[in-house]
């Protein structure tokens, strides 16, 4: 465990922020830097079958140290950080033996407060790694990367029985491209776990069904003084569309298993406007109903427009709820839960109000629930991780490897 913090601090010092709307994968050069560093470290650690694909997927194998019919299992994390907040010049603060109250984030007025983030009350006495208030931290998912690398070092350096362990580090997870170029057959695991969750004990095998909705509105602009009966204001049509979306089914009004519509961006002029929504729901039927709702709204608002004016709506599915794939293999969850209990952790099964690479991989033939990392408040300046939580994640990874070996012997 000695190098866990050192690894994490090294990884977050590299700017690996991904970029949306870019065709190339990885979308940024910084991700290549971390992937090449990890490749070098895996080689130095003595892993085999190390490959780094042209699309930035790094894979490696830790050979089994016991004989038997032991399934090969995998652990996966992503190297990119969210494009939502700066990941450049990350300057972590280490707060040892947290005693409660506000934590100043750098020099200025920014604080990490238990008033806004009550989970801090549960972390008294622990070592917290925070931002300086100017960037995100990058625990999502460099905590997972550091934990997998440390678990490999533990397994390599100790006589802990384990089967073949596969690891992979992917790019562009935050922009939805992490698993698109993942070669499941080449990876060679029967199942895997993404290490990309939150607080200690989280074990996630349910995620949103997700879709994007892009709306283009073409209006007609004339001088306002002579506009009667002629002007078609694209911005007004956009406002009418959004007014039809259920106001109590948005991210800020929902939780748990509740789905939502989210207006992520809107721009335009009288002549043209564009809107971008995301749709999320755990239930597949409700998910399909939400997509139909958006089509009905566009049809209603666009009814009776001049032929030269129109509303164009394009819906694209992003990923689906992996539950239906993971529950077909209950032993995957059983092993993870037992590993947590063996490490004196109470498993907390909760839905992911988002997505992971594991969601797409599960539909590609690699069942892949999500393990905790010990991090909180991702994608912003209030992001932090606990050293104790990271250590627990390493212990759980190692124990999963050990329990899997016992099942096959």
UniProtKB/Swiss-Prot annotation:
Binding residue positions for Zn(2+) 2: 140, 174, 379
Active site: 80, 173 (proton acceptor)
Record flagged with keyword Cytoplasm: yes
Pfam families: M20_dimer, Peptidase_M20
GO cellular component term of the entry, any: cytosol
UniProt cross-references to CDD domains, sorted A to Z: M20_peptT
EC number of the protein: 3.4.11.4
One GO biological process term: proteolysis
Compartments (UniProt record): Cytoplasm
Co-factor binding details: Binds 2 Zn(2+) ions per subunit.
UniProt binding sites for Zn(2+) 1: 78, 140, 196
InterPro entries for this protein: ArgE/DapE_CS (IPR001261), Bact_exopeptidase_dim_dom (IPR036264), Peptidase_M20 (IPR002933), Peptidase_M20_dimer (IPR011650), Peptidase_M20B (IPR010161)
GO molecular function terms listed in the Swiss-Prot or TrEMBL record: metallopeptidase activity; tripeptide aminopeptidase activity; zinc ion binding
Task performed by this protein: Cleaves the N-terminal amino acid of tripeptides.
Protein name: Peptidase T
């Amino acid at each position: 465990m000695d190098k866990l913090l050192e690894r994490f601090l090294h990884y977050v010092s590299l700017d690996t922020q991904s970029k949306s709307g870019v065709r190339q994968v990885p979308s940024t050069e910084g991700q290549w830097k971390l992937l090449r560093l990890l490749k070098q470290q895996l080689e130095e650690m003595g892993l085999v079958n190390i490959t780094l694909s042209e699309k930035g997927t790094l894979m490696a194998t830790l050979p089994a140290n016991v004989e038997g019919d032991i399934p090969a299992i995998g652990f996966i994390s992503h190297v990119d950080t969210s494009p939502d907040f700066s990941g450049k010049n990350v300057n972590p603060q280490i707060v040892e033996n947290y005693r409660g109250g506000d934590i100043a984030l750098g020099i200025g007025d920014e604080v990490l407060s238990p008033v806004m983030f009550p989970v801090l009350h549960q972390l008294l006495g622990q070592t917290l790694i925070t931002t300086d208030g100017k960037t995100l931290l990058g625990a999502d998912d460099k905590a997972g990367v550091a934990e997998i690398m440390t678990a490999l070092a533990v397994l390599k350096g100790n006589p802990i029985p384990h089967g073949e362990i596969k690891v992979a580090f992917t790019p562009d997870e935050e922009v939805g491209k992490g698993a698109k170029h993942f070669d499941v057959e080449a990876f060679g695991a029967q199942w895997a776990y993404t290490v990309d969750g939150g607080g200690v004990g989280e074990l996630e095998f349910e995620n949103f069904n997700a879709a994007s909705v892009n709306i283009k509105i073409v209006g007609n602009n004339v001088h306002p003084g002579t506009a009667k009966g002629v002007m078609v204001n694209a911005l007004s049509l956009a406002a009418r569309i959004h007014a039809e979306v259920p106001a109590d089914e948005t991210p800020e009004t929902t939780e748990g298993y509740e789905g939502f519509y989210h207006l992520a961006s809107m721009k335009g002029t009288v002549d043209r406007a564009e809107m971008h929504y995301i749709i999320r729901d755990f239930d597949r039927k409700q998910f399909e109903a939400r997509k139909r709702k958006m089509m009905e709204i566009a049809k209603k608002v666009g009814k009776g427009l001049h032929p030269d004016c129109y509303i164009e709506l394009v819906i694209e599915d992003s990923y689906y709820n992996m539950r239906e794939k993971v529950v077909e293999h209950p032993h995957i969850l059983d092993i993870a839960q037992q590993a947590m209990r063996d490490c004196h952790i109470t498993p907390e099964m909760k839905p992911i109000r988002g997505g992971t690479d594991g969601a797409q991989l599960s539909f590609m033939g690699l069942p892949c629930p999500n393990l905790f990392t010990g991090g909180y408040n991702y994608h912003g300046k209030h992001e932090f991780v606990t050293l104790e939580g990271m250590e627990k994640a390493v212990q759980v990874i190692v124990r999963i490897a050990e329990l899997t070996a016992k099942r096959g012997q």
